[in-house]
Amino acid sequence: ADNLKEERSNSFSVSADLYHKFGNVQTNLLIEGFYTDLNNVFALRQLDKPDAQGNTVQERYNAYGAKVLGLNLEGKAMFTRWFTLQAGLTLQQSHYDEAIAWNDEVPEQKYKKMMRTPNTYGYFTASFTPVERFTASITGNYTGNMLVGHSAGSGVEKPVAVTTPKFMEVNMKLSYDFTIYKYLTLQVNGGIQNITNAYQKDFDKGWNRDSGYIYGPALPRSYFVGVRVNY
């Protein structure tokens, strides 16, 4: 838009970092609350006139204000020298001050909730080193439901805002280090990415598909092997 203003924000946060030892288990817990007030939030609208090639043109403009607030929890525990566990969880709300239409073709579909902002997401990492040079790790990423815009095309006849499913992606990696010469080390590794096969099931197909209708983990279940040289 011709009169586009910069997006501004005011943010506040408070946190507590706690440490405690339960027997031989060393633990750490971080608790953080956050609040952000956004002004002149950027949004997109479709112009009536296409460009010279006939493509639809979307214009960035200043919408209403918005607020983002939530709670972040992160914990770490070292059970032994060979086993550590770390995990985090974020609970948040992201809303515009007033409901806005996410697509000009369906002005009746108005939402206060921001697109592609799940209310809940988190992660975990578990690392095992039972013997020297060998490491096994299991990691996971959780993404809660969120709103995603699905434009008209091969998938749907008219634009619709879709509530995506929850995803829990779990990965596993095994690695072993071989000393080749003095400080030169060769690592051989392999594993499985996205063991749970948490993956989008409703991709659009065809020439008129909505290429932006993509969400969730980037890859389905897959296997990998690799080598790395450290010195």
Language-model region placement:
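Extracellular/periplasmic, surface-exposed regions of secreted and cell-surface proteins
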Residues: 3-4, 42-44, 73, 93, ...
